Regions:
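Extracytoplasmic gate region of multi-pass secondary transporters
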Residues: 62-63, 256-307
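Helix-breaking motifs and short loop linkers at transmembrane-helix boundaries and internal kinks
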Residues: 74, 106, 127-132, 161, ...
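Conserved MFS/SLC helix-loop-helix module at the cytosolic interface between two early adjacent transmembrane helices
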Residues: 93-131
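Helix-to-loop junctions at the C-terminal end of transmembrane segments
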Residues: 94-106, 307-319, 403
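Cytoplasmic helix-loop-helix junction between adjacent transmembrane helices
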Residues: 137-173
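Helix-loop-helix hairpin linking two adjacent transmembrane segments in secondary transporters
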Residues: 162-163, 170-222
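C-terminal transmembrane helical hairpin of 12-TM major facilitator-type secondary transporters
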Residues: 320-364
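A late C-terminal transmembrane helix in Major Facilitator Superfamily
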Residues: 372-408, 416
Length: 458
């Protein structure tokens, strides 16, 4: 009797458990990670936006006080430039390995570690006001930014599989608002409350919200499991294969290379950083230095309304080709207008450039969770971020080389023009939205889970 029962039951208890774990990792979205309760959705969306805010406020609070740091620590211009470029370099180098780490320990744990590194680095750099500790702790907090930013997309993919565009847009809003608030409020806060030359105190000021957010994250963030493949015994693996054949085949989804996404989003970042980096020098060279403050302020201010506006329609347009193509066309027109029209029109052109850049950034960071399967999101996100910031770092440098070579100020913006064309071409080559298959994946999850239950009951 026992032998007959054993023959009819293909899985032992241990193997059945292994099989269930495999299903959770094999199917795109795990049912137990979805957030379905409305009030919890609101809380988690707010957490995601706050993570974005703090990932930028800590580093964008530095440029306004950079002259004070340079004066007090005796930095050269090269050292000053390295301090501001270090977060971009770390993002370019660390995002890819961070994606692999997300697969191993899960996105929630990676954001936790990232926020801890960010808060610790932001606070500790205020304690030793010398060059080496400042660079070391900037490196530390930048590593925390890379880990947290890479982990957000896989988390959104797990928690909000049907609202990826909207939630990623909220995260993008947090990033952009963090940039704007830190850049605009750091000096007034320092002068009014901390002391006219108390630049070290601003480090502490921006670290406090990070610590508070870390506590909220540990308390309120839902669970998120690692997505690395699970090794099964041969019996369980054979049974999985048999049952999978009787269930609905996995959804075929569009394939897109990380190189494609990385270069496309890197081109967009190059447009933004290239304009920010060369507006002042260009205007000085053409004897229009008085236009620089307005041009820079408009370029950065245009991002916020564009990002907030995209948020309202993000769920409808996320994953579509035309926003990337349209943004590239607008950028080509704007950079041509910047170079060939009178300087008095500069605010018009930088408004178009800033708004288009924000649109592409908001929709672009939604592409990895839309295009990749559940277990591939972290890796694709990490590779994409690394390539994005590598391209963004190289672009402004290339503009300077061209200026030195040809002795023409306008050629510094040639990389921006090429990046705009690249945005059009690579945007047109994206898979169609219909090929993403998220709805089909959701049905596949339910069918796979149903198969687990039916086989276990046998």
């Amino acid at each position: 009797m026992k032998e007959r029962h054993a023959a009819e039951c293909p899985l032992s208890c241990r193997e059945a458990r292994e099989w269930e774990i495999m299903v959770k990792n094999a199917v795109p979205v795990s049912e137990d990670e979805r957030i379905t309760v409305t009030w919890r959705k609101v809380i988690v969306c707010a957490l995601v936006a706050l993570v974005g805010f703090n990932l930028r406020s800590v580093i964008l609070g530095v440029p306004p006080i950079l002259p004070l740091i340079q004066h007090d620590l005796g930095f050269s211009y090269a050292a000053t430039g390295l301090l501001t470029a270090l977060p971009i370099l770390v993002l370019a180098c660390a995002a890819w390995p961070s994606g692999l780490l997300v697969e191993r320990i899960g996105g929630r744990a990676c954001v936790t570690i990232g926020l801890a590194l960010l808060g610790a680095g932001a606070f500790l750099r205020a304690l030793w006001p010398t060059a080496l500790p400042l660079f070391f702790f900037t490196l530390l907090l930048s590593l925390g930014i890379a880990m947290s930013q890479t982990a957000v997309s896989p988390l959104v993919r797990s928690w909000f599989p049907a609202q990826i565009g909207l939630v990623i847009a909220l995260f993008s809003d947090g990033l952009i608002i963090g940039e704007a608030v830190a850049a605009g409020a750091t000096v007034p806060i320092m002068v009014q409350f901390l002391g006219r030359d108390a630049w070290r105190s601003t480090f502490v000021f921006w670290s406090v919200p990070v610590v508070g957010l870390l506590a909220l994250w540990l308390w309120l963030a839902p669970a998120a499991h690692a997505t690395a493949p699970v090794q099964l015994s041969s019996t369980a693996d054979t049974t999985l294969s048999t049952i999978s054949q009787s269930s609905t085949p996995p959804v075929k989804r569009a394939r897109v290379s990380a190189l494609h996404l990385g270069i496309m989003l890197g081109a967009n970042s190059l447009i933004y950083f290239g304009m920010n980096g060369w507006i002042a020098s260009y205007n000085q060279a053409i004897h229009q230095g008085g236009m620089t403050p307005l041009a820079l302020a408009t370029l950065n201010a245009a991002q916020l309304p564009a990002s907030l506006g995209v948020t309202l329609f993000a769920q409808r347009i996320a994953g579509r080709r035309w926003p990337f193509i349209a943004a590239g066309v607008v950028c080509v027109i704007a950079i041509a207008g910047w170079v060939f029209t009178p300087a008095v029109l500069e605010p018009v052109w930088v408004t178009l450039l800033g708004g288009s850049s924000a649109l592409v950034f908001t929709l672009g960071i939604a592409l990895p969770p839309l295009l990749a399967s559940h277990e591939e999101v972290a890796r694709l996100t990490g590779i994409t971020i690394s390539l994005t910031y590598a391209v963004a770092f190289v672009g402004p440098f290339l503009g300077g080389v061209l200026w030195d070579t040809f002795r023409l100020p306008a050629v510094a913006f040639l990389p921006v023009a090429l990046a705009s064309v690249t945005l059009i071409v690579l945007g047109a080559l994206l898979p169609s939205r219909a090929a993403f298959g998220l709805a089909g994946e959701a049905r596949h999850v339910e069918e796979a889970n149903s198969s687990v239950l039916q086989e276990h009951e046998r």
